[in-house]
């Protein structure tokens, strides 16, 4: 497996990976997740590809000529003055592995790549958001040394 930076030529396969990931999330937690429109995804990912720079990395994992995953990391802005959060250089990341390739070390390799990139850019702490229903990903993150540190809560509201 090789990991390389994304290029504009990767747009279509990145859209497919995003759709695959959206379907996975919608299946495990349909109250929260949906499968977005392909054109809207294209706009979002095109901006992401064009916006790469020193404050982030966006890569794909390749098995031969096949893209089997993608991952990105972005260095977060420091907390504003008066914020209770410690001003530790932090980066947030996300990983997607194509169904059928999950559980084979691709996600782990992508995360380790992002961690090296972040450390080389002065980052001291990595964070991510993961659905409670995504048990496989949570297991991997724990194996890699990530710990639960915060909780986001959700309550659907109904109109009277």
Q: Where are these predicted regions, by residue range?
A:
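Conserved catalytic-core motifs of GNAT/GCN5-like acyltransferases
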Residues: 75-80, 127-131, 135-138, 142, ...
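A short helix-loop-beta-strand connector motif used in the catalytic cores of GNAT acetyltransferases and
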Residues: 43-60
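A conserved beta-turn-beta hairpin within the catalytic core of GNAT-like acetyltransferases
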Residues: 77-93, 102, 124
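A short beta-loop-alpha structural element at the N-terminal edge
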Residues: 2-16, 25
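Conserved acetyl-CoA-binding loop-helix of GNAT-fold acetyltransferases
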Residues: 94, 103-116, 120, 139-144
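Conserved GNAT-fold acetyl-CoA-binding loop/helix
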Residues: 23-46
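Conserved beta-strand in the GNAT
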Residues: 60, 66-75
